[in-house]
Amino acid sequence: MLSEIWRYPVKSMRGHQLTEATVEPWGLAGDRRWMVTDADGSFLTARELPRLLLGVPTPGADNGLRLHADGLGDLVVPAPGADARERTVQIWSSSVRARDAGDDAAAWVAELVGADVRLVWLADPTQRPPNPAFARTDDRVSLADGYPLLVTTEASLEALGGGFSMRRFRPNLVVTGSKAWAEDDWRVVRVGGPGGAVFRAVKGCPRCVMTTRDPDTAEGGREPVTTLARLRRFDGATWFGTNLVPDTPGAVVREGDVVEVLEEVEPGAGPLR
């Protein structure tokens, strides 16, 4: 069963739990269409700027945002129009064209994180393909790290022990009722029964220092990476969750939906990699 749905309007800022969401070809509607960059257009995340986690973006009308953080005044940021400054921005090995949100938005985020930054909006989410070694050439992803959605399971979180919050792993979909690490073996899943949303499971998710940042305080530590290194180390990386690509854009997923595994492989090989 689908127990949680999460959307992250601004890459590396706080997420919002939803009761339902529309699936688009590049991810959930409104997920990671905004991003923080340096002055040269290179993407920045809470890996480098942990205080990004303390920003609370609330989606508004016409793709706009309201930005909030304790100690800072709220700021309403309209989605930049066609006449806004367009910039080439870099996210990992991809370059895309995005619209700059202006100096007020940049100043607000700069005050939050203590660095010279810009805030940009991806007006055209059809520009960026995922890694073709794992996805199809016509698949697309917005400003998520690599793939449109991430699914995790409550059983796998419980298997880690330690009382870790699922929020550290920043999933889009959380599933309950499976066995621990069952998501390693999924290849096609459907959410919502016949006529529901169908996803391809294309690659496991290697985890980084982001998971060691407390999502409420931005304080760093060694967990859960230390535990993952003990329990979930494959090919020199630590893994938790599985990346998904939508095959039924326009479908709606809802909290409480049935989750069916339509195709899977024999267990034992670990995450798809």
Residue ranges and their predicted role:
Residues M1-R273:
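Metal-cofactor-dependent catalytic cores
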